[in-house]
């Protein structure tokens, strides 16, 4: 068993320094994202099904024509390749779970040398 206290993990650079909590090929990837007040994750998509959990604060999420204001405890789910954006006025802490990891067509890159 592994466990994490999501409120105690430091994310000093906000969205520029997400913290990968767990990543296992064929399974899932869990990432903690801290957003500072006014930060935004612009329109993007991922190859995996994604679940986004608001751990602290509040965010506004747009996906296509839908817009949701999501507060503490809200869980949002996105299909693979579904475009979406996330923004916060007051700051937020989010848990992102991607599964299966990596998704079909996910860019693998090459190892650093």
Language model regions located:
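A short, N-terminal "cap"/entry segment at the start of jelly-roll beta-barrel domains
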Residues: 1-29, 62, 110-113
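Residue-level marker of beta-strand positions
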Residues: 40, 75-77, 93
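A cytosolic small-molecule/anion-sensing beta-strand core signal
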Residues: 55-56, 71-72, 90
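Structural motif
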Residues: 58-60, 67, 83, 93
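Short acidic-glycine-tyrosine-enriched beta hairpin
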Residues: 64-81
């Amino acid at each position: 068993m592994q466990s994490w206290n999501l409120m105690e993990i430091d994310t000093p650079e906000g969205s520029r320094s997400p913290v990968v909590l767990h990543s296992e090929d064929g399974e899932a990837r869990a990432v903690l994202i801290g957003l500072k007040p006014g930060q935004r994750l612009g329109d993007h998509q991922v190859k995996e099904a994604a679940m986004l959990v608001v751990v602290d604060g509040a965010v506004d999420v747009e996906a296509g024509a839908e817009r949701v204001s999501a507060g503490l405890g809200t869980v949002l789910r996105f299909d693979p390749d579904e475009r979406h954006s996330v923004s916060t006025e007051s700051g937020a802490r989010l848990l992102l779970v991607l599964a299966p990891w990596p998704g079909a067509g996910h860019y693998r890159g090459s190892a650093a040398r």
